[in-house]
Amino acid sequence: MDSYVTVDPSFHSPRISLEILVPTKYAKLFTLKQLSRMLALSCKHRARQAANPVSKRTSRDRNGSKTMGQGPSAVAPQVSKGHNQQVDGGVCLAPVKSKRAVRREKRRTAAKKATNKAKTETKLVKKGGSSIHAPKAPKRTSYLSSLLSSPSGAKAKMGALSKPPQTKNAPDANEGGFTLTAITPAECRAEARRRFHPITGSSRGPYGFCTRSREGCGVCADCVEKKAHLDFNRSFDTIGTSRVIRVDSMMEEVAEDLASPSVLEPSGFWAPAEKQAPSGEGHSRRRCDVVTLARVTPVLRMLRKVDPTLVDNRLLWEAAFRTVFPQRKCVYPHGCFCDRG
């Protein structure tokens, strides 16, 4: 089936024989002149390829051309049927990048972008220096503090470029940005009973008496406030908690463009110990599951960013939970704070 073609002697080269074996389908397609031109071009291309240094991954076939382990080795110049015939006989010798080379190029560009981004990122500079109130690193870090500062045990892999954590704007717990204090429910009730709001600092008036009925109508502002206060106090008995973890943020001087709620959490932001971590005191305690907290916490931050006035923790928790889990009837995973289901 194959036919021998004798090449014009003007294309002589000491390394290449005068006769090339051309498949019959190509011999029918092209004239002798075109075939000889193809041979000359392929020789040039082979020489050009041979000049390039061979990487470890590539190997050479018998003809000296590089093979990447993909497709047949380049023994003869292949012509695709459907293409329009070119001047050189339909052979396009433009160097085509292999899939691996394309992937390598993509990886390099991504790495360059990442390094450039890391260079341009600005860090939060504190004017006050190291804080006096910086607490000692706790033996058992609570779940909230592990959200705020990445744990020291988890080291990023050398080669892998990991995404920056979502909490990167939050101050480090060990730098005095936050103090985690465990207080008793009695202390928490006492704080709630104070006349000024622990977060906003605005003074709260005393609970008024319902003007409509002696028992309380349950509709007016005074009744609503009184009921919320009673529910809050009763919540400690419902959960059966022994400690409450209060998170105080140290108010530091921060540049005005950084003074956003994501950078400085409101002071007095506290959460029941159930939402934190296992107590480790021997007795198991019902607490919010970690998945729930991990899904709700970013929403809390977003809500606080949208509306900084929405700092009351209970309101925030409920709003975030409704956002994340709209199908659940009750906001709290282990039953409600109040008794109305």
Swiss-Prot record:
Transmembrane residue ranges: none
Residues covered by region (Disordered): 46-175
Official protein name in the record: Protein P3
Miscellaneous comment text of the record: This protein is encoded from a satellite RNA, called RNA3.
Organism expressing this protein natively: Grapevine fanleaf virus
Compositional bias (Basic residues): 97-116
Record field: compositional bias (Low complexity): 142-152
Lineage, broadest ranks: Viruses, Riboviria, Orthornavirae, Pisuviricota, Pisoniviricetes
Family membership: Belongs to the nepovirus protein P3 family.
Coiled coil ranges: none
